Amino acid sequence: METKPKTATTIKVPPGPLGYVYARACPSEGIELLALLSARSGDSDVAVAPLVVGLTVESGFEANVAVVVGSRTTGLGGTAVSLKLTPSHYSSSVYVFHGGRHLDPSTQAPNLTRLCERARRHFGFSDYTPRPGDLKHETTGEALCERLGLDPDRALLYLVVTEGFKEAVCINNTFLHLGGSDKVTIGGAEVHRIPVYPLQLFMPDFSRVIAEPFNANHRSIGEKFTYPLPFFNRPLNRLLFEAVVGPAAVALRCRNVDAVARAAAHLAFDENHEGAALPADITFTAFEASQGKTPRGGRDGGGKGAAGGFEQRLASVMAGDAALALESIVSMAVFDEPPTDISAWPLFEGQDTAAARANAVGAYLARAAGLVGAMVFSTNSALHLTEVDDAGPADPKDHSKPSFYRFFLVPGTHVAANPQVDREGHVVPGFEGRPTAPLVGGTQEFAGEHLAMLCGFSPALLAKMLFYLERCDGAVIVGRQEMDVFRYVADSNQTDVPCNLCTFDTRHACVHTTLMRLRARHPKFASAARGAIGVFGTMNSMYSDCDVLGNYAAFSALKRADGSETARTIMQETYRAATERVMAELETLQYVDQAVPTAMGRLETIITNREALHTVVNNVRQVVDREVEQLMRNLVEGRNFKFRDGLGEANHAMSLTLDPYACGPCPLLQLLGRRSNLAVYQDLALSQCHGVFAGQSVEGRNFRNQFQPVLRRRVMDMFNNGFLSAKTLTVALSEGAAICAPSLTAGQTAPAESSFEGDVARVTLGFPKELRVKSRVLFAGASANASEAAKARVASLQSAYQKPDKRVDILLGPLGFLLKQFHAAIFPNGKPPGSNQPNPQWFWTALQRNQLPARLLSREDIETIAFIKKFSLDYGAINFINLAPNNVSELAMYYMANQILRYCDHSTYFINTLTAIIAGSRRPPSVQAAAAWSAQGGAGLEAGARALMDAVDAHPGAWTSMFASCNLLRPVMAARPMVVLGLSISKYYGMAGNDRVFQAGNWASLMGGKNACPLLIFDRTRKFVLACPRAGFVCAASSLGGGAHESSLCEQLRGIISEGGAAVASSVFVATVKSLGPRTQQLQIEDWLALLEDEYLSEEMMELTARALERGNGEWSTDAALEVAHEAEALVSQLGNAGEVFNFGDFGCEDDNATPFGGPGAPGPAFAGRKRAFHGDDPFGEGPPDKKGDLTLDML
């Protein structure tokens, strides 16, 4: 297979500095919004804020820039100087280093700086320690304010810096060009802007990090150049050290954080660097190996490298080095997406006051809390995958045989405090005697120190992490007991609390209290096997192949090689276009709302009697049948499309962008995206390590420097091979743009000069653009060449995908949602004796058990029952989707998919389906949920929380997260959401003899079950994604068109529903009351919908709750609730003096000549248990066609 030729796109970018220091008076308007979006700890004056046009940068801000990174000698005698430029883009975060106290802290949790310092020491990471000489030359925020004429007590100073050069600022390799300062306007206010340039400008041909930036006599400084004062601001440097370098050091397992900063800065300055960037004396975490493998601690006496974990340690550092290099390449990328503009946010539409706008932002951020919680509490989250394990050679007899899966990432959060060992496996001095926690089966509690490590030991990011966790619940919705914060705080005044961060008055907001409240969801690291990575990403395209049959009959498959057709013509004949036409026609009939697939359209006004139900169902069936017939006719007759093979190759697919401006406007969400990308880069690099090691003397001291370029090239060669798509750009300077830079001789206070010549050092760039995630539609068995282990895994899955033969309850069938919602209109007399309330559960249970008195049914009732039964049986006979429709949109799409499956002769196995768990927000459902935000603590905590709840609209941050599920993903993905999902990357060679490594990003699962998200269900036939929509909130909305299994309340209730029966509602209510107790009264209609996925039953639950409260005179009583439930059960259990009963079992099956779905040739219920009646080679009913002719739809 030949490599596709790379086509380079030329893009023009303006020259500029590597960053700016913005200095402004603290704004009177917008400060609350800025505080909500920022990350700040209450014990610090610094903060991290998002880069937002109109809030932190001016309108027209150029995100892409050719950074002036150094100078070169030119001319015959090397006397002239030209500038060297490198493309980059501005970081999506800005760093507030003076005046951060004017921003409200992200959380009231006390002493987060102390916690981070303690955690850093405990896990062995280095602290920020400026050199004594540097402190003499500090440029303070007060000094800058004085120079710019700002009041230091009312000023806000922050750094806006390019992505590739943040570390250069951190290690003092830059200076402020004071003479080049100018003024811009942000939100109507005047703001000073001081350019920041690298010191390398004064050292021609010096493309390295300057180890001693304050040495004005450095020998590389050009002759007659006036060397400037390096920019050193201690709060800023510490902030960058903690919030930028710290997370990378944790992800790459490098305890020497300063070395990571210097390595990243060096990669930015030296575009030709090839060897190792991380230091040679890097240390490693000792941990006990997974079962059946040798320990990873000290040397295994006399054994070779692999036996003592030497190759595992080597793979760990080399993969980290390669990931750092890959991140450096991405930092030099140029992106199309501009930074988000706050004036264009749709969530502000109609919000006229500052308070209303702040409330809208608070509500949106609470949505994202659900995704943050999933990343923290999922055991395979990228945040936890910080160590490398070794599965051993693929062939124990031949160690040189390469294996893509020998080295892999494993959760390391709980073993981070283990002893550190050196390259040879010897324990590092200072770590002797430390206990070694095992990878599996440890008893460590997830504590505040672990949470600090996930944030890179940054108090600001930790504060924002707590902001989100305070808006998560402890999975109350699935029946878990959540800690009573009021009682805990009150009791703690008389007992010892294992926390020295808080006092009695601040305990309610302490990080320890928040983690205690969420204790039931803490990650439990019970496996160290190679598995999927839980990643956080962003959909930045409204296009995705997430329909029920994915990319079946897609544009690329139908396109003719001669290019004789227009794109529009081809698109009209795709499966995707057919689904759009079906949905558009149903929307015209007012049955659905395409933008909200779970909505019922105007059905409440349409279905007012049984005849209307017949009409709606028949219309849906006719619309789908017509489109499917036309689609298959076009595919078979018009295009000779191999439609059966096409189904086997169909995938659900979507792409996650690497564009940093597509992420949510929050530093912590950007951190989650960065950590996810680093995990993916390392996974790719680890897959190539064994191939690099094979046949080499890995113990050699120079091995890393010699072979790091080889590994880096191998990783780069994996681009555009199925998973990580890359884009090649040719970068040129904007036409007519003058290269302005500080004078090299006049000093840093002199104005800029524009007489420089210069060129771009990195002209052609190939950089990753997006990650492609896919899931095969059909359950595929193991291939013939698969390993025995793979075949065994597939065999274990077959039972989960096997379609059972049992007959499904009518209410759990295709029309169940309509029958429950409109029962009163369809069967107004379908109510238990003695009751005035029509009850569908009682009616259909009695009917299907042949217990319903015939006298209760009119002729019209019987005709409707026959119609419903026939549709349900016919649908069940061809159904291979393991989900019942919940609305007309799902009914139409499922029915359409099943019809296509019937044409393709699909049988036996359910197909894979997708479910989006959509993050939402609401005001706190109880006083307990608001405890962390109370202005009063200690004895006044409950009163403070109640006061907040009484005036909740005055608190823009007082929102909590919630979830709702949706089984039609295309509209969800069209909202370009932030997502969290499992990702498993397979690697394989191409055709025989080809050494090109292809990959597939497989849609996998988050481990941790209900810990990750309360609505996650253990079902192998379903793939889940957590989604927080952006379109319609922080970006323009686009129009539609063109783990471990854990029993929970959620599953218990759905099990009750699936069993059916007349008393389903009362049984569900009783189970909930017994599980949740008094918390049942706090469940709102959204909670019931999330639990039950049934609108009718949700309304019943709200009514039963109201009756229980009424029975208890406004107070909740479990006895009163159970009494109400038993009364409801007794009511629907009465059948009275039945007399002759209606025989539902025999009714409707006597007409064997009735025409089932799909016309005369389609299999009806009579064929449900038999072999298909039509020939396997002909999808339309008759025998094989004449070999001389083409297959046509009319061959029946």
Swiss-Prot record:
GO molecular function per UniProt: DNA binding; single-stranded DNA binding; zinc ion binding
Keywords: DNA replication, DNA-binding, Host nucleus, Metal-binding, Zinc, Zinc-finger
Highest taxon, organism lineage: Viruses
Pfam families: Viral_DNA_bp
Presence of keyword Zinc: yes
Biological process, per Gene Ontology: bidirectional double-stranded viral DNA replication; DNA replication
Motif (Required for filament formation): 843-844, 1142-1144
Phenotype when changing A475G: In strain: Nonneuroinvasive mutant HF10 and 17 syn+
GO CC terms in record: host cell nucleus; nuclear viral factory
Subcellular localization, as worded in the UniProt entry: Host nucleus
Residues covered by region (Required for nuclear localization): 1170-1196
Region entry Disordered, spans: 1158-1196
Composition bias type Basic and acidic residues, residue spans: 1174-1196
ZnF start-end (unnamed): 499-512
Protein role: Plays several crucial roles in viral infection. Participates in the opening of the viral DNA origin to initiate replication by interacting with the origin-binding protein. May disrupt loops, hairpins and other secondary structures present on ssDNA to reduce and eliminate pausing of viral DNA polymerase at specific sites during elongation. Promotes viral DNA recombination by performing strand-transfer, characterized by the ability to transfer a DNA strand from a linear duplex to a complementary single-stranded DNA circle. Can also catalyze the renaturation of complementary single strands.
Subunit structure of this chain's protein: Homooligomers. Forms double-helical filaments necessary for the formation of replication compartments within the host nucleus. Interacts with the origin-binding protein. Interacts with the helicase primase complex; this interaction stimulates primer synthesis activity of the helicase-primase complex. Interacts with the DNA polymerase. Interacts with the alkaline exonuclease; this interaction increases its nuclease processivity. Interacts with ICP27; this interaction plays a role in the stimulation of late gene transcription.
Sequence similarity: Belongs to the herpesviridae major DNA-binding protein family.
Name of the protein this chain belongs to: Major DNA-binding protein
